């Protein structure tokens, strides 16, 4: 499946409201994303941001 152009999801290289790629379920370290194309910063953000579940339970 083709990944989405970063412009389509309003990708930015900086966090938004404390949310960032490194805490998103779609982020794949060190610098890629399951759904957004291209090099992705761990400190970036886009409208597809989905926070990881807190594992502390």
UniProtKB/Swiss-Prot annotation:
**Record SUPFAM superfamilies:** HIPIP (high potential iron protein) (SSF57652)
Residues binding [4Fe-4S] cluster, per UniProt: 21, 24, 33, 46
- Superkingdom of this protein's organism: Bacteria
| InterPro entries the UniProt entry points to | High_potential_FeS_prot, HIPIP_sf
- What GO biological process, any one, is recorded here? aerobic electron transport chain
Q: Which UniProt keywords apply?
A: 4Fe-4S, Electron transport, Iron, Iron-sulfur, Metal-binding, Transport
A GO molecular function term, named singly, is: metal ion binding
Q: Per the record's keyword annotation, is Hydrolase included, yes or no?
A: no
Query: Any keyword Translocase?
Result: no
* Biological function: Specific class of high-redox-potential 4Fe-4S ferredoxins. Functions in anaerobic electron transport in most purple and in some other photosynthetic bacteria and in at least one genus (Paracoccus) of halophilic, denitrifying bacteria.
State the family named in the UniProt similarity comment for this chain: Belongs to the high-potential iron-sulfur protein (HiPIP) family.
This protein's assembly is summarised as:
Homodimer.
Give the protein's recorded name: High-potential iron-sulfur protein
Identify the species of origin: Rhodopila globiformis
């Amino acid at each position: 499946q083709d990944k989405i152009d970063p412009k389509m999801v309003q990708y930015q290289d900086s966090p938004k409201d404390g949310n960032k790629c490194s805490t998103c379920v779609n982020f794949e370290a060190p610098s890629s994303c399951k759904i957004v194309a291209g090099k992705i910063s761990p400190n970036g953000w886009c409208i597809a941001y989905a926070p990881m579940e807190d594992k502390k339970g």
